Structure formats: structure tokens, C-alpha cells
Amino acid sequence: MSTLTHFNAKGEAHMVDVGDKSVTHRVAVAEGHITMEPETLALIRSGTHKKGDVLGIARVAGIMASKKTSELVPLCHPISLTHVEVELSTADSPPSVHCRVTAETRGQTGVEMEALTAVQVALLTVYDMCKAVDRFMTMGGVRLVHKSGGKSGTWDLKGSG
């Protein structure tokens, strides 16, 4: 197993030095879901929620969150994102909203944290907009499913997609 990179020889937290890394095209894909009561899902699908377009607002929230990741995660590098796509879909069994985010950059460090942050905030936005009608919503399954670029090459979670 590799060692933790965010600690120095004294065991103190530090931001990893990426200055000597090559600038490469990097991609990360993350996903997660929020389960809910069937009536809540019907409200989202119908577009009649009194707060507005739940999925549209969650999509924008995810994009905005990806751009703020380094402000939220203390040792995360601020990076220049070149593309962020937030895909939201619904399912009947179990009643849920699935979120899949693709984030891209050309840089010296990966873009996984931005993709993961976008998923979390998009799902939190669904929760926030629907909590008045459903306190039983549960978020889960947030994970990285693809990473490419950089010296570690391409990694894919088996069975994802």
C-alpha cells in the first residue's frame, strides 16, 4: 500500500508539491445517489415542486461546487477546470436520483476531488429542495469510478458505467 502523501516526515499536514509534475489532460468521473419516497420522486419528475426545477438547480449547484473544491477541502490544490458535466437521472426502484459528474483539466494534479465534491453538493441540493416533503431521503454510493491522466495512468472501478 502507498503512503499518505499529505503528511511530511514529521507527520504534519501539508499541501503536496506538484511543481515537477507534467501538465497533462486529466479526467475524473464520480457518482452517487439519493433515495427518497416515491411521492418525492414524482414531485421532482413532474417539475411542479414549489421551489422550482430540482434537477436543474442541482446540476448548477454541482458545477458551482466543483469550482470551489479547493476552498472546502483544506489540502486540495486550486485547479483550472476545463470541463464539468453533471448528469442527473431518476429511477423507480428504489425511488432515487442518480448523479454522475465528469470533470476535466489540463494540469499537474488530478481532478477527482472536484468530481466528488460536485456529486455531493448536487445531491445535497436535491435534499435541501425536497426536505420539506421527505425527511427520509438518504444519500449514498458516492465514489470515484474513473480517473485518467497523470503518471498513475488510467483507473476504472470494475462494474461502473
UniProtKB/Swiss-Prot annotation:
Alphabetized Pfam families for the sequence: MoaC
Gene3D superfamilies: Molybdopterin cofactor biosynthesis C (MoaC) domain
EC number, as in UniProt: 4.6.1.17
InterPro entries (UniProt xref): MoaC (IPR023045), MoaC_bact/euk (IPR047594), MoaC_sf (IPR036522), MoCo_biosynth_MoaA/MoaC (IPR050105), Mopterin_CF_biosynth-C_dom (IPR002820)
Reactions that this protein is recorded to catalyse: (8S)-3',8-cyclo-7,8-dihydroguanosine 5'-triphosphate = cyclic pyranopterin phosphate + diphosphate
Domain of life of the organism encoding this protein: Bacteria
Coiled coil: none
SUPFAM superfamilies (alphabetical): Molybdenum cofactor biosynthesis protein C, MoaC
Key words of the record: Lyase, Molybdenum cofactor biosynthesis
Gene Ontology biological-process annotations: Mo-molybdopterin cofactor biosynthetic process
Positions that bind substrate: 75-77, 113-114
Active site: 128
Keyword Glycosyltransferase: no
Function (record text): Catalyzes the conversion of (8S)-3',8-cyclo-7,8-dihydroguanosine 5'-triphosphate to cyclic pyranopterin monophosphate (cPMP).
The protein's name: Cyclic pyranopterin monophosphate synthase
UniProt lineage: Bacteria, Pseudomonadati, Pseudomonadota, Gammaproteobacteria, Chromatiales
Encoding gene (name): moaC
